[in-house]
């Protein structure tokens, strides 16, 4: 059985995950809801992507629900949606305000229901408007459009200090740990990560929660005319409209300024120098481990990738650099010298001094910039997460006290204890245990394999693997081969997903025909993997991996959509 602290299967929070893929499931004009609808999953964020409906229909379907269960069942489930809102006080997953209920005016609840419905419908329209733009897996290598939008908006990105993170693997977990630490310190935080699992609002969070619909709609309505102006200027000069990712970045920085936040913790989307997030200057720049990924866009060697990533290190900043291969380390060192940034290297300025697997995570000790931190509980699995935590601690020390002041012990322990990283070696079901992990490149798969060996014990572990066609599927499968007793290959909801037959052929060459099963549909593949895991009785498990999309798909299939 897995060495994992039992917890409520429905209690999953947080909104991010590791991996450098940036909303890899999207093509131009496509909503993530389109893909999930093919699985027959009709959640409020995914089903009926292109249907038109009036407000009453939307209230009935998305805000109030079908009346088949819940508090309304006890009151007769009025057929009229408004009446159901009045009698139950529940509007879908939104509780009508207690003030409205206490007032004795049932119409107030109905008005709130309609207002909530209108806001949610408008938010969905906004998402679809943004999705119609060039997708983020095909970025335009320029900062001109984002800079122009920022200028027109009064440069909101200058209204808050920023901790900026780049890397190949580990940057989302590190971003989440940094955010939790500074929030526990009492600062109001804005966090930007990508891609999202289930709702694009996950990308933009305030104090750890996705931006609320009311603020999203209001800020979008404020900035949309300026985005249209930039589009017009660019296309009039033979350029392109702002891309999906560029617009999301502008929206995020505007939301952070509107809040306002005390600090923004921002993960790059892709690369560094020409990533849209780089219109803001980080007072602390963090570089997590670099490896080969997105070679089409970033280059075929780690040196090429390092030259792109180093662009987030700005003059006078602190550069917190996780352990790198020597070639990468030298490139980053030269950048720090060139811009007069202070380089704080893992192994020199900070380090993991001890770690031991524990129930529900691990115990770690860290040498920080300002002192030692011993016997910290981290509820994440694997040595790579211990190093991510150490990097996050160093980044926060640099931000709060220039690396000269220790983080308060109570603050540190409370923050780490509350850290989550959905989609990263996450337990989403029991009997059999189902894990999801967003590993999508060989380095990520190797870290996953080591974390499994370190933290879990299965009598039989079955892989459920779906990867994108432009990824190094062979090396990913090879990295996992010693860990998996059997592998079920399939496709995920991305139109870029590799054909299962092609993936199965690769797997058979590495694993042997008797250890490989090909299933075309992911829901059927999940059922098959679970059955294979149960073949030898208790102690079996399923590992769903190969892509951010695969992790999100399996979470959705198993009803884990909280983010």
Please annotate each region the language model reported.
Residues 263-268, 275-286, 290-292, 304, ...:
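Nucleotide phosphate-binding/pyrophosphate-handling subdomain across enzymes
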Residues 1-167, 174-185, 192, 232-239:
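Short functional linear segments
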Residues 325-335, 340, 360-363, 433-435, ...:
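C-terminal helical cap/extension that packs against the catalytic core
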Residues 256-262, 455-459, 529-541:
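Glycine-rich phosphate-binding loop signature in dinucleotide/nucleotide-binding domains
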Residues 56, 230-235, 260-267, 282-375, ...:
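Acidic, Mg2+-coordinating active-site environments of NTP-dependent enzymes
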């Amino acid at each position: 059985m897995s060495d994992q602290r039992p917890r409520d299967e429905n209690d999953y929070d947080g909104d991010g995950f590791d991996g450098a893929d940036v909303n890899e499931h999207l093509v131009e004009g496509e909503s993530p809801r389109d893909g999930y609808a093919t699985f027959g999953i009709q959640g409020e964020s995914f089903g009926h992507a292109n249907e038109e409906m009036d407000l009453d229909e939307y209230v009935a379907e998305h805000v109030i629900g079908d009346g088949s269960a819940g508090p309304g069942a006890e009151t007769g489930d009025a057929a009229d949606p408004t009446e159901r809102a009045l009698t139950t006080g529940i509007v879908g997953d939104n509780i009508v305000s207690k003030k409205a209920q206490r007032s004795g005016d049932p119409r107030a609840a109905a008005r709130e229901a309609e207002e909530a419905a209108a806001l949610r419908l408008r938010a969905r329209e906004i998402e679809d408007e943004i999705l119609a733009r060039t997708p983020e897996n095909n970025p335009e290598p320029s900062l001109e459009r984002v800079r122009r939008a920022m200028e027109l908006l009064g440069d909101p990105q200058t209204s808050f200090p920023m901790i900026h993170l780049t890397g190949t693997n580990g940057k989302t977990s590190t971003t989440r740990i940094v955010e939790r630490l500074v929030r526990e310190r009492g600062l109001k935080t804005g966090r930007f990560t990508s891609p999202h699992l289930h709702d694009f609002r996950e990308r933009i969070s305030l104090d750890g929660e996705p931006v609320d619909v009311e603020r999203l709609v209001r800020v979008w309505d404020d900035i949309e005319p300026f985005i249209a102006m930039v589009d017009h200027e660019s296309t009039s000069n033979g350029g392109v409209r702002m891309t999906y990712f560029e617009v999301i970045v502008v929206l995020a920085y505007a939301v952070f300024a509107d809040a306002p936040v005390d600090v923004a913790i921002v993960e790059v989307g892709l690369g560094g120098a020409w990533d849209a997030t780089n219109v803001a200057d980080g007072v602390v720049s963090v570089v997590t481990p670099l490896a080969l990924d997105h070679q089409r866009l970033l280059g075929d060697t780690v040196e090429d990738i390092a030259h792109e990533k180093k662009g987030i290190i700005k003059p006078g900043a602190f550069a917190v650099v996780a352990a790198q291969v020597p070639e990468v380390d030298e490139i980053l060192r030269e950048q720090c010298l060139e811009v007069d940034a202070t380089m704080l290297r893992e192994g020199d300025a900070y380090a993991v001094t001890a770690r031991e697997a524990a129930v529900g995570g691990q115990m770690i000790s860290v040498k920080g910039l300002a002192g030692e931190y011993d016997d910290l509980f981290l509820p994440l699995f694997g040595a790579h997460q211990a190093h991510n935590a150490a990097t996050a601690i160093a980044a926060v020390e640099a931000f709060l006290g220039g690396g000269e002041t220790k983080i308060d012990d109570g603050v540190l322990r409370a923050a780490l204890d509350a850290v989550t990283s959905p989609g990263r070696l996450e337990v989403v079901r029991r009997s059999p245990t189902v894990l999801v992990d967003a590993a999508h490149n060989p380095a990520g798969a190797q870290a996953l394999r080591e974390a499994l060996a370190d933290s879990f014990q299965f009598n039989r572990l079955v892989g459920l693997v779906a990867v994108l066609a432009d990824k190094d599927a062979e090396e990913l499968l090879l990295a996992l081969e010693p860990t998996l007793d059997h592998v079920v290959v399939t496709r995920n909801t991305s139109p870029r997903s590799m054909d299962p037959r092609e993936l199965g052929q690769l797997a058979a060459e590495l694993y042997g025909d008797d250890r490989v099963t090909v299933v075309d549909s992911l829901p059927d593949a999940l059922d098959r993997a679970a059955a294979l895991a149960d073949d030898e009785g208790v102690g079996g498990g399923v590992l769903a991996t190969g892509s951010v999309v695969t992790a999100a798909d399996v979470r959705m299939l198993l009803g884990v959509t909280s983010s």
